Amino acid sequence: MFLQSRASRLLAQLRAAGQLLGAPRPWPGPSPGATRTRSSACGPLASLSAHHPCARTSAGVGAWGAAAVGRRAGVRAWAPLAMAAKVDLSTSTDWREAKSFLKGLSDKQREEHYFCRDFVRLKKIPTWKETAKGVTVKVEEPKYKKDKQLNEKISLFRGDITKLEVDAIVNAANSSLLGGGGVDGCIHRAAGPLLTDECRTLQNCETGKAKITCGYRLPAKYVIHTVGPIAHGEPSASQAAELRSCYLSSLDLLLEHRLRSAAFPCISTGVFGYPNEAAAEVVLTALREWLEQHKDKAQQALMQVDRLIICVFLEKDENIYRERLPHYFPVA
């Protein structure tokens, strides 16, 4: 009797403590005539994640409640109050859970979840100002004036865009946003199936527009998906405008989400058939004019973009941009 009485007192104390903390208490069962229902409210802890130790379990009783009805209702029942479990991005089936988990990590902690170990940090990517030292193209009449500040915000990089550790990489997507060939397929495979799951909720994308998702297993924190025009042969004025809109829409999302660095692939120049040289002219004009328009805001600390990277994969495209960049971002 003494032991039973003592256990009852301990149980009552633990229940009272749980009530003071706003944690859910174990349901003792219905009173006579009551239906077997209970409120889903959880007091001050109602907003906590399902993986928080004080959140409800699938059975409707939180860790606090589970502690209170432990095998012997002793002080050791506090043990369940532990750190939330780490999300495994390779097996998780909940993109919302994974996205929330990644947002709570530091840059160093995110590295553990990258799909690759040979990722490229932003500081390892030279600016156009540095790259231009090895460019022998002479431009007598550049299209724009020399601007040292803007030359430090542009980079030309040849390599795998999926391995760049930047705030966002841009995906040359199709209208479904569910993955395809070329760089689109590479990005989806590297990021993992959760990227496709989130894209499925975006319900397609129009040509020239852009939408943003988490980067998941990519070194990039976000993926900006944009749909370029299909242009086989000489592009029309409307197709050129749509390609320009791809870059400007992506840059708008960059500002909206307060991101500081982004890498762009060659949009529409693959299976979409846009001529590489013509595309480069559209791209460089759009980037130069956008940077100039936002330059004053940057100086007022209203907008800070550290780097815009033109990421090419083919030697052909690298040569085109090396030849055209001095016309839009002169260094001499």
Language-model segment annotations:
Residues V170, I187, I224, F264, ...:
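Conserved, mostly hydrophobic/aromatic
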Residues L218-G233:
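Short, basic/glycine-rich phosphate-binding loops at helix/coil junctions
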Residues K133, D197-K221:
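N-terminal short beta-loop-beta anion/metal-coordinating cradle
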Residues Y144-T207:
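Short, conserved "active-site rim" segments that organize catalytic pockets and cofactor/ligand binding
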Residues D167, K221, R260:
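Conserved acidic residues
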Residues F2-G29, G33-W64, A68-P80, A84-K86, ...:
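Phosphate/ribose-phosphate-bearing ligand recognition and processing surfaces
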Residues I161-T162, S175, R217, S268-G270, ...:
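Conserved beta-strand elements of beta-rich interaction domains across eukaryotes
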